[in-house]
């Protein structure tokens, strides 16, 4: 008879700190071994429960759920110990989830989740306790030579768990196993307590031990050869067979048999697939269905009062009846499916958000197709006007939970979640956990670090793995020849790779789902344990989004959409200004959708900062499409995707719109005029999933529910299923007297485009948001751009683009200023955008609060006044330096001038003095503060300072900043150049040989020349091992990525430095990946090279006094130090004559920046310049 044994202690990958067991391989291994049951006891969690339960039940293996827990010590200073709890029944499940949740909420200390002994005693019903062998407090007492203490503890736990307590023993070849085992056997005999054998499993196969050790080291942040790392595991902790365990404990057969007895006692029935909603409060005397109908019809009347004003609408009753019929149809289905409660809950929290100043999106996903959602103000787009289908959202022929994804303003989303928690009970509302895994690139670095390999090797190997969504190590190995070759020749790289493959995809950490929130009908722990951080914040379910829904909880998506925040910020500024002139506040929901200036802006593709329409590729499509109505904008969102772009659908759509191609419904060769109403909005093109459904309805008599099933089948592309569906479609068409050939051809066309079809409901809702942002940009450009800049102010690349757009729009922009700026970008009374202080690096909300609080007493007069008045505990020297170099303190300097030209002329002197005075200003302020705090008058520290004294007197001789120094200061603090650009120094001359700016480049096969500064550089090797490079060029007008393949890179390598000014020649093409342009470089020149190659001569304009004695010698020495190939001509003026002199060939020079700057410093900027051919 084969041995019987059940593993009762096992950690999966979800233990996070250790454990390498993955659920599916575990179930497969158990099936192969013929084991009837298994327990999963992850450390402090039940995150894997649903996956484990489903997979085990599916394979005919009995799942036992449990957990290993850290137990507090009676002595607060004593060591922690473990216990293992197994669930016997539903009450045990609830108790274990309560214990684990309580541990996270109330028991976290120093990164450990600790369960108090009293909690276990209070919640022991329905649970079996294993003593955790040598890691339990009884085992620790035995090993510590305290048998009396061990006995007392065992008696205590036997009383708490009568007939449900087991002394656990192990033989895993770890220190103290046998000592604890012998003590447990003796104690069992004395007390009559049963023994149970476990193997404390951490991995499936014995050879996985090394991988497990590596995983543990990655979690600890230590290397395998680090003597400080924990060594708590052995290679015996694998999933041993029943025979191996029986042999291991052949002297203690009862300990093996008890594993089976425990398995028999554990009978948990996890109900999966049934959904539970909280009760929505309804008025007395009404059922939920009656109330649901009432609020829906009340909402319809409110909507129709705007959509169909009774006094001005022709055929009012007939038009109203269309809405009533659709509403009744939807209500019947929703009630029949049992979902009124879901709609009412969503309606309630959206209405609360709108009533409490939290902007809500007009809709998202297929939910925008529901009229019930529209009349309940869950969505804000009329589904009838845009042919949006309810069945795309809720299909009565395929019952599944409705799923509204709701967009909220980022600033207010958490307030809405807090409202829901308050309404339904904080113990019933939670967000949802996510699990981060060891992904392809990251696992290579993690393994290399754990193995003690060099950073350089880890970096090199990781960079060979392509940065693509869904990339795996196996895929990377197959497609990257350079990677395969490297692994073959480098032994250390091969070691990393082999281990990384074993650990790839293993769960590494936890996070919070972007928007998922669950609302339980009772307390959450009846369904799922809770996880949270040490502060008790950020409560999340321990089941992920799929598992939590399987467990019966309904997920609501509270998503944060940055664009809604932008619209909200813009409206606050707009309505502030409207209030000043007694105009009513603007409501974005009621702007006209046929606004001419908005469509003019869109047709010109001036869509930087417009939601969804910002990329270069999108702008090109907009220019071709020339959209002139909201239907076109909705279509645009659906068209700009890889499928339509690559299929020719986009060109066909554009040509049909502009009359360059025949309108056909759907194809010139096989038309069915009955499809015209369905396809007219898209000029006969099958663009939307809803159109696929409507074609099946119109031609073949499908219900829209059945048509949705057809659409789904087409998306799966299973040949047998498609053949069946094709037959049904043709048969349905025959019933409508439609020719079989025509039906077959149209079916084939629909099938082809079904794969490209987009959800029109989503496209329409997001198209409306795009229109709203375009409308704001067209009518209120400054408030809109200030809001966009505020939303993106920590994304330097975006700010650069947006500031350039502000300049293109000819909006006025004020530099940051401590006297007028707020944290965010704002608009002042003159309509100028004021730079936000929060956009300065190192200046967070704390320093800005200190500044705005201090200036309530009046504007700052100078740097000393500023330092004396602000709280220097919140503004340190580094912050002050950043404020000066960004220009935020320019107005406090001695050379500031309100007139722009005068300000620009003195800006470098001004900032130099401020920087020089900074230390003294800080010391003076600190001294004043100390004196004030001590309560003594400072007799000498300011008593005799005159009101108009020059506080900068001793600093005025500070060396003036150079243009480069000033601009570097701005780049370091703002991430961009505000008062100029390094290219300004060269602007006049580079336009002689690089006539195009980056923003003006267009794809062409001809070689184009552009000049700019290298702001990013990336070097890698091609498949042959040759170096190639990628640089990002910036010329203030824009940025472009340029690629240098091996030959070009080799020639230009010495010139490729960050912040270097270069002139580049190459071919410009579209970059499908970024949606922008890419430059393939043929040649790179430094500015000196470009001058040498393209300049005719260096021209000097000098007078007699410039060439006397020392000056002439100085000039000769300087020119000798810069010999080269560029000729010099001199325009010489004496009191008697003016002549043009050509220097001889021996005086030819290299026109380097250093030479030109030295000459300009000596003779003046206007007297030294390069002449070009």
UniProtKB/Swiss-Prot annotation:
**Its Enzyme Commission number?**
2.7.7.7
Q: Matching CDD domains, A to Z? A: DnaE_OBF, PHP_PolIIIA_DnaE1
* Alphabetical keyword list: Cytoplasm, DNA replication, DNA-directed DNA polymerase, Nucleotidyltransferase, Transferase
What is an annotated GO biological process for this record, any one? DNA replication
The broad enzyme category this protein falls into is transferase
Out of the domains of life, which is the source? Answer: Bacteria
Among the entry's GO cellular component annotations, what is one? cytoplasm
- SMART domains per the record? POLIIIAc
GO function terms (MF aspect): 3'-5' exonuclease activity; DNA-directed DNA polymerase activity; nucleic acid binding
Q: Where in the cell is it found?
A: Cytoplasm
> What Pfam families is this protein classified in?
DNA_pol3_alpha (PF07733), DNA_pol3_finger (PF17657), DNA_pol_IIIA_C (PF20914), HHH_6 (PF14579), PHP (PF02811), tRNA_anti-codon (PF01336)
Q: Which reaction does it catalyse?
A: DNA(n) + a 2'-deoxyribonucleoside 5'-triphosphate = DNA(n+1) + diphosphate
Which PANTHER family has this protein been placed in? DNA POLYMERASE III SUBUNIT ALPHA (PTHR32294:SF0)
- Function (record text): DNA polymerase III is a complex, multichain enzyme responsible for most of the replicative synthesis in bacteria. This DNA polymerase also exhibits 3' to 5' exonuclease activity. The alpha chain is the DNA polymerase.
The entry sums up its family as follows: Belongs to the DNA polymerase type-C family. DnaE subfamily.
Q: How does it assemble?
A: DNA polymerase III contains a core (composed of alpha, epsilon and theta chains) that associates with a tau subunit. This core dimerizes to form the PolIII' complex. PolIII' associates with the gamma complex (composed of gamma, delta, delta', psi and chi chains) and with the beta chain to form the complete DNA polymerase III complex.
- What is the protein's name according to its record? DNA polymerase III subunit alpha
Species annotation: Pseudomonas fluorescens
**Phylogenetic placement of the source organism:** Bacteria, Pseudomonadati, Pseudomonadota, Gammaproteobacteria, Pseudomonadales
Q: Which gene encodes it?
A: dnaE
